[in-house]
Structure formats: C-alpha cells, structure tokens
C-alpha cells in the first residue's frame, strides 16, 4: 500500500508547482487527516463550530515542519476535491500562523489543472475578501475547543516557495532513505 505522505513525490516542478494530497474537501465540517502510521484517512474530529473549510485542505508529500506534521496546503479550485485526491498545485502564497504558540504555516495554492484559477500567480491577485475569510476561519474554528490560533500575516509566492523547499529539506534530514 502506498503511504500518501512518504511514498508520493512532492512533484518534479517544486517549489513552483507541488503535489498536494487533499485530506478535507472545501465545504466540509469533518477534519480528516492521514494517519501517520497506517497511511489511511482517519476522522480527527468534527469541527466544534458551525464553520466549514473554505478551501480544499491537505499537505505536501515528503515535507516536514516544526509541528511534526507535513506542510499544510490549501488548494483553491472551482470544485471540491475528494479526500486523498492527488492534485498538482501552483504555490501562490502562505498564511503564517501560530497554533497554540506553535508555527503552523499554510501554503496557499491554486489547482494547476483548473482553468478558472490557474492564471493566478501570487496571493496578491486574490480578492481581498477571500484572505479575510481564510483568516476568520482559522482564527475562529478552534475557539470552542479553547485553543488559540494567531494569523500573523499573508506572504507572497516567493516566501511560500522558500518555506516549501525548507520543509522538503527537513523531511530528507528527518526521514533519510534506507
């Protein structure tokens, strides 16, 4: 069985275009994640509030971050992408975030094969209200769990690509090939 985190390439055009593994489709209240040991999708929890995910949400394979998880990615598309869908995603920015005091950046990307969004090259091209929606969702979705999330800022594609490269490098150091 292929493990979505360890056995799938981050993509041969990274950091500009990466592979993303979707865990949660846009519009869902269920928080799914790939089980680190078994590589299958598990229900982490149903969101405590009436919020729903504003974008397709997942991770970049063979990436690793300080929170001991793969690097998160939000993939914008005109369609809801099913959990465990592999999607080529053009990196356009990053939302810098602290979750309970721990760094938890979210890469913002567009589906490379979706003509309704693949012309977007940088987060600055998104409608300002969309980034406000993302900020609001991530600041508020854990409040009823008594957890604190702080959105520091949104940054451009250049910084986002550096964060992608750093996470791929950390993965290689943390999980050396046998």
Swiss-Prot record:
Where is Mg(2+) 2 annotated to bind?
A: 72
The record's Gene Ontology biological-process terms are: phosphate-containing compound metabolic process
Q: Which UniProt keywords apply?
A: Cytoplasm, Hydrolase, Magnesium, Metal-binding
Specify the superkingdom. Bacteria
Amino acids binding Mg(2+) 1:
67, 72, 104
Q: Name one GO molecular function term.
A: magnesium ion binding
Q: Where in the cell is it found?
A: Cytoplasm
Q: Which cofactor does it need?
A: Mg(2+)
Where mainly located? Answer: cytoplasm
Signal peptide feature range: none
Q: Which family does it belong to?
A: Belongs to the PPase family.
Q: What is this protein called?
A: Inorganic pyrophosphatase
Gene source species:
Leptospira interrogans serogroup Icterohaemorrhagiae serovar Lai (strain 56601)
């Amino acid at each position: 069985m292929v493990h979505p985190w360890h056995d799938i390439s981050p993509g041969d055009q990274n950091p500009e275009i990466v592979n993303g593994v979707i865990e949660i489709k846009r519009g869902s209240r269920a928080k799914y994640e790939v089980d680190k040991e078994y590589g299958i999708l598990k229900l982490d929890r149903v969101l405590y509030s009436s919020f729903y995910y504003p974008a397709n949400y997942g991770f970049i394979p063979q990436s690793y971050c300080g929170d001991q998880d793969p690097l998160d990615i939000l993939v914008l598309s005109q369609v809801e992408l099913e959990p465990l869908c592999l999607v080529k995603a053009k990196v356009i920015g990053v939302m810098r975030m602290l979750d309970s005091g721990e760094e938890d950046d979210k890469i913002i990307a567009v589906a490379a094969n979706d003509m309704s969004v693949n012309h977007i090259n940088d987060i600055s091209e998104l409608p300002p209200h969309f980034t406000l929606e993302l900020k609001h969702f991530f600041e508020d979705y854990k409040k009823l769990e008594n957890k604190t999330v702080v959105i520091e800022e949104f940054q451009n594609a250049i910084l986002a690509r550096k964060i992608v490269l750093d996470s791929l490098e950390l993965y290689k150091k943390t999980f050396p090939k046998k």
